[in-house]
Amino acid sequence: MGTHLHIAHRGYRTGLGDNTIAQLQEAIRLGADMIEVDVRRRRSDGELVLSHDKGPNETAPRLRDALALARHANIPLNLDLKQNHLSEQLVRELREAEMTERVVITGGGWEQALWIRHLEPRIRVGLTIPRRHHDWVRALGWAVNRAWRYVWTGRVDLLLKATHCDLVTVQHRLVTPRLVTQVHRAGAEIWVWTPDDAGTIARLVAM
């Protein structure tokens, strides 16, 4: 049995709202090992902000403020990118905050992950196994859905080697002992989202 991280999802999902500075502070107070936040670019001013959903996001916290808080508290962040074409701006802000070695980048597609790694090799990046297939695949029905998941989970070790990612993030219902073995065989970590009950967490830890 290996090491397990407790990662606060979207800061820490309470009545304080998702992806807020107050949530980050609460996660720090509760002793989380890491904090996951969602990152987008705000339309009005181009600022990188903490937000899961599309929209104006005028009141969303700035990423730079979250980075400053995390650096002061000495806690790492998992930045889950919710759109593409953020690489250069993201790397610049991480360097300015001196957080390049204290973050893990997930989401946004493996192409963006590879480009971030090219721009700044010190940043760790993750390969996200999708929960759903694309709309055009969905139209082909259940059989293709099964095949799609097999492609991703059947030989994920080869995908890791091809993309040079440090870890895999996967929806907890897709996790199997075989998948865990393949990820570890590739020298990578497996991160699971988002189990919310003790029984599911215990089952995953036992793998």
Regions found by a protein language model. Give the residues of each.
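Phosphate-group recognition and catalysis centered on beta-loop-alpha active-site segments
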Residues: 1-207
